[in-house]
């Protein structure tokens, strides 16, 4: 069961701005390192994500994936060196398996309030320059 997170408020706001209905397929796992979401990892989160997306598309064939929204990084604060390479692989795999090579990817920057996160925040800031069709939502000022 998914808990209520910032995605709900984001979807409400975006829906109001676009004056359209927004559907989210959520596969959040708090406190989880990026590597656990990789294809073929023993946790199976990647496969569960694909299953949920494909199930939603079967139930609503009039819909299509519009973007991947990603907000993660705290659990990679100590293992940040390979973060961008792993994230690039994850996004490429999702795009390939969904058959949408230019599917936008939007990352939310984690909070800057904790100095232990400084290295991973620096890596996350590089996402738009490292992953095609990617953008970043800054946490500056929060």
Q: What is the predicted role of each segment?
A:
Residues 1-142:
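Cell-envelope and extracellular/periplasmic
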């Amino acid at each position: 069961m998914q808990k209520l997170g910032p995605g709900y408020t984001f979807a409400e706001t975006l829906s109001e701005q676009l004056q359209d209905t927004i559907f989210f397929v959520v596969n959040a796992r708090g406190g989880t390192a990026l590597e656990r979401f990789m294809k073929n990892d023993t946790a199976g989160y990647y496969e569960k994500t694909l299953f949920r997306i494909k199930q939603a598309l079967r139930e609503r064939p009039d819909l299509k994936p519009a973007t991947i929204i990603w907000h993660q990084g705290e659990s990679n604060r100590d293992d940040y060196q390979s973060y961008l390479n792993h994230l690039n692989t994850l996004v490429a795999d999702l795009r390939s398996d969904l058959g949408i090579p230019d599917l936008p990817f939007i990352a939310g920057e984690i909070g800057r309030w904790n100095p232990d996160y400084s290295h991973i925040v620096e890596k996350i800031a590089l996402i738009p320059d490292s992953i095609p069709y990617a953008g970043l939502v800054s946490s500056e000022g929060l």
